[in-house]
Amino acid sequence: MSVWAFAFFSLFLSLSVRGSAEQCGQQAGDALCPGGLCCSSYGWCGTTADYCGDGCQSQCDGGGGGGGGGGGGGGGGGGGGDGYLSDIIPESMFDDMLKYRNDPQCPAVGFYTYNAFISAAKEFPDFGNTGDDLMRKREIAAFLGQTSHETNGWWPAAQGDQYDWGYCHMNYNYGLCGDDLNLPLLQEPELVETDPFIAFKTALWFWMTPQSPKPSCHAVITESWTPSAADSEAGRVPGYGVITNIINGGIECGQGGPNNANENRIGFYKTYCDSLGTTYGSNLDCYQQRPFGYGLLGLKDTM
């Protein structure tokens, strides 16, 4: 299996979902966090105020170091200070857009925090910071739309709208991106399961990193990608649909439509665009696009 195939399967597919994935406290038989980390009220381990502040269950001095902790401080990359991403998507809007992510019925309750998202994004200074305000908002909506589809916890009898249930399930982002991020993800894949900062950071790495012949999702949504002759012949035109093709084209694209997966991704995207006050752009689906990685005679290249 190639680097790309491994990254594809490990970074954006929910490989398994647990009924309860909490790590510590009363949610996990009063277990303590490793390395002296704080145990949050929701049963997750970390070092920031989300974990060591109100409701902390044990080891609340946060004595462990840990890899980023999922919280608010730091983050390299120079993506700007508090006036960066938080100007476009303040915490109140994040909470409203992902309003059920902390519902007790969600396996990932309490895991995906706003501070973890903002801190991880600062590691990628071009994310949500390219182009005018409409484009910046469109990229955030596209990222949250695609990742919400991968972590969706909605079911037909659930309260609220289908597109209110993003970031409900865990999404296990292992992979060779650890080499780029200097994280031992192959040896310690549980880092993604236990640290929301790392979970967001690996997803953003996937979003920002091209994997030939695929462009990066960032390049597509910021209109800096120009289709090659092969792309044009395959019907791959700029727009949100190409991002779906990048992520899961072999299953969801080039088969006509509609299909539930495409429509779900588009539904999340439109909902978040509306919340952020931006336009959708064109070419939202990939129904008429051949997947990347198809070679001569229409046979799928061996990855």
UniProtKB/Swiss-Prot annotation:
Gene Ontology terms, MF aspect: chitin binding; chitinase activity; endochitinase activity
InterPro entries xref list: Chitin-bd_1 (IPR001002), Chitin-binding_1_CS (IPR018371), Endochitinase-like_sf (IPR036861), Glyco_hydro_19 (IPR016283), Glyco_hydro_19_cat (IPR000726), Lysozyme-like_dom_sf (IPR023346)
Region (Chitinase): 82-303
UniProt-listed GO biological process terms: cell wall macromolecule catabolic process; chitin catabolic process; defense response to fungus; polysaccharide catabolic process
Keywords, alphabetical: Carbohydrate metabolism, Chitin degradation, Chitin-binding, Disulfide bond, Glycosidase, Hydrolase, Plant defense, Polysaccharide degradation, Signal
Source species, domain of life: Eukaryota
Enzyme Commission code: 3.2.1.14
Catalytic activity: Random endo-hydrolysis of N-acetyl-beta-D-glucosaminide (1->4)-beta-linkages in chitin and chitodextrins
Signal sequence region: 1-21
Record carries keyword Hydrolase: yes
Induction (UniProt): By wounding.
Coiled-coil features, chain-numbered ranges: none
Cystine pairs: 24-39, 33-45, 38-52, 56-60, 253-286
Enzyme class, UniProt record, top EC level: hydrolase
Task of the protein: Defense against chitin-containing fungal pathogens.
Sequence similarity: Belongs to the glycosyl hydrolase 19 family. Chitinase class I subfamily.
Protein name: Acidic endochitinase WIN6.2B
Species for this entry: Populus trichocarpa (Western balsam poplar)
